[in-house]
Regions:
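N-terminal accessory segments
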Residues: 1-178, 213, 358-361, 366-370, ...
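Conserved adenosyl
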Residues: 2-6, 132-326, 361-366, 371-373
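Short acidic-aromatic active-site loops that bind/stabilize oxyanions
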Residues: 30, 187, 191-199, 336-344
Length: 378
């Protein structure tokens, strides 16, 4: 199908297409969330490596609503609806797509229904949203960012720019971390997100060239959540005695782990002593002033040869179009919308925090999963 006007400026046509795609961009994450919650990607994965399934085959494998064996039993239009959703994901290389020949010479086999002419499979990208051998994926992160509590805060972004304030606080009347205590379902999604993403990142860190845990005897994870990070670290480094430190209401939900002691408290008051402190995705939640107070508390808790192991994204000074940079800028805006003073930082900003907190400098040790492992040394 040729363009109506072959003399049109192709560059202008492309720019127009890009602008329309941008205007409609919210469609993709909402469709992706529905596909994840319907367990479509899981159904394709369970069909085996390299499997390609038609919409009807996928629909037949999905758990049905209450009282129905499959979703088709309740909604005969489900295969067509799935097809329309999945072809969008294929256009973003989230799924593969192949087309069945409807005019096959094999007269013994019935021609597939029109809705089933497309077959869908998983790309390497899609596999990050299917539970891996550890039962974790990025699916909870996708669902968390689409949670109504977060989505509603974006409607206050304009007002926050005009009047000041934090969008999340404007909507809910309290900071995001306090809101977690109010909404158990939201808290559950948040904790699952932290566990899954931490497990994925931690495994990559432990498989990387980073050797910073080898000489550590006592490791304190500040803001360690339910302790999954320390469980992985101590499993790989059994010589380490670890303290998982977080707010008391978080620690109450933490399961027991060998070599890990759970301690509740307030990191802005004090932190437990150790010869190394781990902080992963902590500093980006807080303003510079809060970070300096926290870092000074860490400085007091460490011996002269102690260090903080910081795991965070590091912003480039100049924006570029790489996926890593886009992800960091998106996370930076998540922080701005949800946390007072929360932000991603550049190398220079991390150095200013380190020296302001009493540390001599920073070593940028290893780059894993778009994150830097940094050491703040005394």
């Amino acid at each position: 199908m040729a363009p109506c006007d072959t003399n049109k400026d192709q560059q202008e046509e492309q720019q127009y297409s890009n602008a329309v795609e941008l205007a409609l961009s919210p469609v993709l994450p909402f469709v992706m969330k529905a596909v994840v919650e319907l367990q479509v990607l899981d159904a394709i994965a369970e069909a085996g490596p390299g499997a390609q399934l038609s919409p009807s085959q996928i629909a037949s494998r999905l758990p049905g609503p209450a009282g129905a064996a499959t979703i088709v039993e309740r909604n005969p239009d489900a295969p067509e609806m799935l097809d329309r959703m999945l072809r969008l994901l294929a256009s973003y290389s989230i799924l593969t797509c192949s087309v069945v020949d409807l005019h096959s010479d094999d007269h013994d086999s019935p021609a597939p229904a029109l809705v089933d002419r497309r077959l869908y499979g998983l790309t390497p990208l899609a596999k990050y949203f299917v539970p891996d051998q550890d039962g974790v994926s990025l699916a909870p992160l996708l669902c968390l960012t689409q949670e109504k509590a977060f989505v509603d805060s974006w409607y206050q972004l304009k007002g926050a720019v005009l009047e000041g304030g934090i969008p999340f606080h404007k909507v809910h009347g309290k900071p995001a971390f306090e809101y977690l205590r109010k909404d158990p379902m939201f808290n559950e999604v948040f904790n699952k997100t932290m566990i899954d993403r931490s497990t994925m990142v931690n495994k990559k860190i432990l498989e990387s060239s980073y050797k910073g845990f080898e000489q550590v005897q006592k490791l304190v994870d500040v803001g360690g959540g339910l302790g999954a990070t320390l469980n992985l670290i101590t499993s790989k480094n059994p010589h380490i005695k670890a303290i998982n430190f977080d707010l008391p209401h978080v620690i109450q939900q933490a399961p027991p782990y060998p070599s890990v002691e759970h301690v509740g408290g307030d990191m802005f008051e004090s932190v437990p002593k150790g010869d190394a402190i781990l902080m992963k995705w902590i500093l980006h939640n807080w303003s510079d002033d809060h970070c300096l107070k926290l870092l000074k508390n860490c400085h007091k808790a460490l011996p002269d040869n102690g260090k903080i192991i910081v795991v965070e994204g590091v912003l480039p000074v100049m924006p570029d179009s790489s996926g890593a940079t886009k992800g960091l800028f998106q996370m930076d805006l998540q922080m701005m919308a949800q946390h007072f003073g929360g932000k991603e930082r550049t190398q220079e900003e991390f150095l200013a925090l380190a020296t302001g907190g009493g540390f001599s400098g920073i070593k940028f040790e290893c780059f894993v999963c778009d994150l830097w492992i940094m050491e703040f040394y005394k």
